[in-house]
Amino acid sequence: MSAEVALVYRVLPESVEVDIEKLKNAVVNKLAPKYKVDKVEVEDVGFGIKALRFFIRMPESDEYSSDEVEELLRSVEGVGSYELEYFSRLSF
């Protein structure tokens, strides 16, 4: 069995006006065809701003990359910024 890679991205919306649930769904839908989103957490940042934390799993393969995940995040309307918080190889 091949190993997998776990990624955790923290995503901030462009502004406080962005609907956080719509943004969450848009990101999940953009990633879902290829990447497995295990969990999404909503975090209060302050001043009415909420951040989203995406827990993503992907096979360890040349066909998958964090660069591609970041390209997909950039392409979602409403995403202001993102940060890779965690990257680890999983093997069972």
Curated annotation (Swiss-Prot):
Pfam families: EF1_GNE. Gene3D superfamilies: 3.30.70.60. InterPro entries: eEF-1beta-like_sf (IPR036219), EF1B_bsu/dsu_GNE (IPR014038), Transl_elong_EF1B/ribsomal_bS6 (IPR014717), Transl_elong_EF1B_B_arc (IPR004542). Keywords: Elongation factor, Protein biosynthesis. GO terms for molecular function: translation elongation factor activity. Promotes the exchange of GDP for GTP in EF-1-alpha/GDP, thus allowing the regeneration of EF-1-alpha/GTP that could then be used to form the ternary complex EF-1-alpha/GTP/AAtRNA. NCBIfam families: PRK00435.1 (NF001670). Belongs to the EF-1-beta/EF-1-delta family. This is Elongation factor 1-beta. It comes from Pyrobaculum islandicum (strain DSM 4184 / JCM 9189 / GEO3).
